[in-house]
Amino acid sequence: MPSPKSKSEAAPDLSEVTAIYQDLEKRVLPRSCQISTRCCRFRLTGQVPFLTLGEALYAAKGVRASGRKEIKPNPEGACPLLGANGFCTIYQHRPFGCRTHFCEAAGGVYPRKHLADLIQRLEALDEKLGGEGSRPLPVAVGDALQVRRACRR
């Protein structure tokens, strides 16, 4: 993972990620999460969320806030951010895909065409931060934890 473009910063400014997520929260999505965590079971579903650099850095902030310095693979193939209690350990910092992906029981995936403007903002931020496009969650967050650690030095 590339480091953020401005190495002089103590840490990348993630306020745009926060703004994008706040804009998403203002939209009424005709879906209702059933909290089954099926979508968090990557091996079971065969689907892994992809994160831009901004999303990964924001998620890494949540990982650190939960008291961890790294993420470890889940032996059952679930999201490494899924807690033993079945809840997301970084819920407030969860990625865009986790905020917009809904299983069939909840109404299915929300059409991306209704979220295209927010996705474009995440992609523009990725470019601004020096990212190279979306990457699988475990890799992106793991690398972001390394970047955040380097920025603190």
Name these PLM-found stretches.
Residues M1-R153:
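Short loop/turn segments that flank or connect secondary-structure elements
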